[in-house]
């Protein structure tokens, strides 16, 4: 039996972010819809060719998406909210954009659907909306069209479908007490229709993704797998039931009773034993072993992968693949021309990971030919050399980390005592207005950074120019009447990458882009060694901004857990220790900001929830060290220094005790798309500290009206005492234009002023 290689998905953005540029050009009216569609077709053809050249046996189709693959699935199932529908009931790419971002070149602006994190990754998906009695039908046929494209090019393909149970799990019911699982019977006929269309095209295998199977699911959801995968989806192409991001051993009793033809298991994030899987799964099933890490950039230890799988060779049909979609990996290491050659030898990006699968397949298919095993050893040799590299180990960091005590994580006084001191210091009005940190990253700002890196300008010119942008941001905020200001973060390319550039233990790529959501891409830093701070990072900019105004200016830090979660971490050190190292480095930054006269310091932790293990039984351990890392970072602050934190894309009802334990003086959160429903949790738990619920959605170009914001603030005031309410957008304003920013913030400030006057009148 020949071992085959495949991946669960290929990055869709293009080597040079062609998809991002095409979409934004289309949104801005610079290219036509047909030109946009042509770009997508060219990218898909290029990606298939790259995979074929890398030696993969089967190529995925259906991994391409214009905004998000979950949103694509919604359109395929005709699950389009009424507010987003075209007048004639049809769906097209503009429908997709209205759902995802609230705006498209055609149709009217409308509230976008919610966006949240894809399991515990830094990728975002658009949350499907479900209603009572909802019907489904085959809508957008992008998948079928892409299958036809790939077949016409002569490729051996494996279409991808997001499975019906996971699709329902990932969505949200719009009515209270409505069980979205009840829609399964209405959903399955559409899946049958899709599978029939694929079978008609001669498709042998379909990858049907059911990542929800790695979770600790309620009984009803477990039982639903029998309904979906016994008879309903049979009689078409063979189904590869695909799981990722964790182990599936706890659900093997369910999986083995389903009428599928193979199982893919993530053997990187999960701890499933391949021998147990082999003994447990039906003998006629394919076992697809996800042994190449789809979520990190490190070169694989191929000899250990070979050892892990060799006993299965000849025992059953075996495929080797990526642990998950390579959506989460940069595309090609070979174009990184400035990276230290030693460090570069430690990595593998998407193209290189495909090659790793080919090398592993070659060795497994030729067990008797030792030269192929020698090739594996030669390939992985740089990983073993890394173990003694001076770029990895810092004894002083290790000593400092080992000396951490419980006292390092405790503020001097309780919040109720601190807040009185802080209110006396800052003398802010009720409903104080602020922003989350960043202001628009204009072409001029991005050009400055590019010119500095290319040597076209010197550091002095760059600093003066950044100071001018900071001055503009302060002037704009003063003119708008905001109460607590920010310096605007003109010097920052990305909230994580910027800090990584100024900390020892990180390295950076030129083109290591991955998709975050829609057209937004990020270039995560890579943690290669022990972390320390050689000198202050943000103090110079914060001090300058504060010198321009009498109003308080926030110092802006990215928290240790977020830096960890949004970087590619090292694989030879546990996450708790890495987070502690980052926290200690940023702790020193808090001290220096205070010494520079900065009285409000925001430590953003938007990734706190996404770092949660997928299995609830492992949450306590993670939350303990994650909260400790935040407190280790923040607790050094004086009592009259106000610590803020920001979290977005989060649901807090099941981690509220940990949010309270963080002991931030003020927390700002994303709530506008959920219409302030998130605040019910804060009321239920009697959240004791100040809170700023986001009053408008910065991910959409739509401008909120004063009345919209007032309505949201009134809802918030019913849940949170008004003396503890702050007024702010959902998130940073980096991706918005100045025109959008001025209009939205002006309406936000005016809304706050109106409610202040009402409150003063009611008190008089």
From Swiss-Prot:
Needed cofactors: Zn(2+)
Catalytic activity: 5-methyltetrahydropteroyltri-L-glutamate + L-homocysteine = tetrahydropteroyltri-L-glutamate + L-methionine
Molecular function per GO: 5-methyltetrahydropteroyltriglutamate-homocysteine S-methyltransferase activity; zinc ion binding
Keywords: Amino-acid biosynthesis, Metal-binding, Methionine biosynthesis, Methyltransferase, Repeat, Transferase, Zinc
Chain positions recorded as 5-methyltetrahydropteroyltri-L-glutamate binding sites: 17-20, 117, 520-521, 566, 610
Keyword field contains Glycosyltransferase: no
Positions bound to L-homocysteine: 436-438, 489, 604
Residues that bind L-methionine: 436-438, 489, 604
Residues annotated as binding Zn(2+): 646, 648, 670, 731
Active site: 699 (proton donor)
The keyword S-adenosyl-L-methionine belongs to this UniProt entry's keyword annotation: no
Pathway participation: Amino-acid biosynthesis; L-methionine biosynthesis via de novo pathway; L-methionine from L-homocysteine (MetE route): step 1/1
InterPro entries xrefs: Cbl-indep_Met_Synth_N, Cobalamin-indep_Met_synthase, Met_Synth_C/arc, UROD/MetE-like_sf
GO biological process entries: methionine biosynthetic process; methylation
Disulfide bonds: none
Enzyme Commission number(s) of this protein: 2.1.1.14
Domain of life: Bacteria
Family: Belongs to the vitamin-B12 independent methionine synthase family.
Classification via NCBIfam families: met_syn_B12ind, PRK05222.1
Role this protein plays: Catalyzes the transfer of a methyl group from 5-methyltetrahydrofolate to homocysteine resulting in methionine formation.
Listed name of the protein: 5-methyltetrahydropteroyltriglutamate--homocysteine methyltransferase
Organism expressing this protein natively: Baumannia cicadellinicola subsp. Homalodisca coagulata
Gene of this entry: metE
């Amino acid at each position: 039996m020949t071992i085959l290689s495949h991946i669960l998905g290929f990055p869709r953005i293009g080597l040079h972010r062609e998809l991002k540029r095409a979409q934004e050009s289309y949104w801005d009216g610079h290219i036509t819809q047909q030109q946009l569609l042509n770009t997508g077709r060219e990218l898909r053809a290029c990606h298939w060719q790259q995979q074929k050249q890398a030696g993969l046996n089967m190529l995925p189709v259906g991994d391409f998406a214009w905004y998000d693959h979950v949103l694509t699935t919604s359109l395929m199932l005709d699950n389009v909210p009424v507010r987003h529908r075209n007048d004639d009931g049809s769906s097209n790419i503009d429908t997709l954009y209205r759902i995802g971002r609230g705006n498209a070149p055609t149709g009217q602006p409308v509230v976008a659907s919610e966006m949240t994190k894809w399991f515990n990754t830094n990728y975002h998906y658009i949350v499907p909306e479900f209603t009572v009695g909802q019907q489904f039908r085959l809508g957008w046929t992008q998948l079928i069209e892409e299958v036809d494209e790939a077949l016409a090019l002569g490729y051996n393909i494996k279409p991808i479908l997001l499975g019906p149970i996971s699709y329902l799990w990932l969505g949200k019911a719009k009515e209270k007490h409505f069980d979205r699982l009840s829609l399964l019977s209405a959903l399955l006929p559409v899946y049958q229709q899709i599978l029939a269309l694929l079978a008609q095209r001669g498709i042998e295998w379909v990858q049907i993704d059911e990542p929800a199977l790695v979770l600790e699911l309620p009984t009803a959801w477990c039982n639903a797998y029998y309904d979906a995968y016994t008879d309903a989806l049979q009689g078409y192409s063979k189904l590869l039931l695909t799981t990722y991001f964790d182990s599936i051993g706890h659900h093997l009793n369910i999986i083995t009773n389903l009428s599928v033809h193979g199982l893919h298991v993530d053997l990187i994030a999960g701890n499933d034993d391949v021998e147990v899987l082999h003994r447990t799964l039906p003998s006629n099933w394919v076992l697809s072993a996800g042994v190449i890490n789809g979520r990190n950039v490190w070169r694989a230890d191929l000899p250990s992968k070979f050892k892990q799988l060799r006993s299965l060779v000849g025992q059953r049909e075996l495929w080797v693949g990526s642990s998950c979609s390579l959506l989460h990996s940069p595309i090609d290491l070979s174009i990184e021309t400035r990276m230290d050659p030693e460090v570069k030898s430690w990595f593998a990006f998407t193209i290189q990971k495909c090659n790793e699968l080919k090398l592993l397949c070659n060795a497994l298919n030729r067990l008797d030919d030792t030269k192929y095993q020698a090739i594996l050893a030669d390939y992985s040799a740089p990983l073993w050399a890394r173990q003694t590299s001076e770029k990895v180990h810092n004894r002083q960091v290790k000593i400092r980390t080992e000396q951490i005590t419980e006292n390092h994580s405790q503020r001097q006084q309780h919040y109720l005592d601190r807040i009185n001191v802080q209110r006396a210091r800052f003398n802010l009005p009720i409903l104080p207005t602020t922003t989350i940190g960043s202001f628009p990253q204009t072409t001029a700002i991005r050009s400055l950074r590019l010119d500095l890196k290319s040597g076209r300008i010197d550091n002095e010119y760059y600093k003066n120019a950044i100071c001018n942008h900071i001055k503009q941001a302060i002037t704009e905020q003063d003119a708008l009447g905001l109460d607590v200001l920010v310096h605007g973060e003109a010097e920052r390319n990305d909230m994580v990458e910027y800090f990584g550039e100024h900390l020892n233990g990180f390295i950076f790529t030129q083109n290591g882009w991955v998709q975050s959501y829609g057209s937004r891409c990020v270039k995560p830093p890579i943690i290669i060694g022990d972390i320390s701070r050689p000198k202050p990072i943000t103090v110079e900019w914060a001090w300058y901004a504060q010198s321009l105004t009498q109003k308080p200016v926030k110092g802006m830090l990215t928290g240790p857990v977020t830096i960890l979660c949004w970087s590619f971490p090292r694989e030879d050190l546990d996450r708790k220790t890495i987070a502690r190292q980052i926290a200690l480095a940023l702790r020193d930054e808090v001290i220096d900001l205070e010494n520079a006269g900065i009285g409000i310091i925001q430590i953003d932790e938007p990734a706190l929830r996404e770092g949660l293990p997928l299995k609830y039984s492992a949450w306590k351990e993670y939350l303990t060290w994650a909260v400790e890392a935040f407190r280790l970072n923040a607790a050094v602050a004086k009592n009259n220094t106000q610590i803020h934190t920001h979290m977005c894309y989060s649901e807090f009802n099941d981690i509220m005790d940990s949010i309270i334990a963080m002991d931030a003086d003020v927390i700002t959160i994303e709530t506008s798309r959920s219409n302030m429903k998130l605040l019910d949790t804060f009321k239920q738990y009697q959240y004791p500290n100040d809170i700023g619920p986001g009053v408008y959605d910065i991910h959409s170009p739509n401008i909120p009206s004063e009345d919209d914001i007032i309505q949201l603030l009134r809802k918030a005031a019913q849940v949170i005492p008004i003396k503890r309410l702050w007024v702010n957008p959902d998130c940073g304003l980096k991706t918005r234009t100045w025109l959008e920013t001025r209009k939205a913030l002006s309406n936000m400030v005016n809304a706050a002023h109106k409610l202040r006057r009402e409150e003063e009148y009611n008190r008089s």
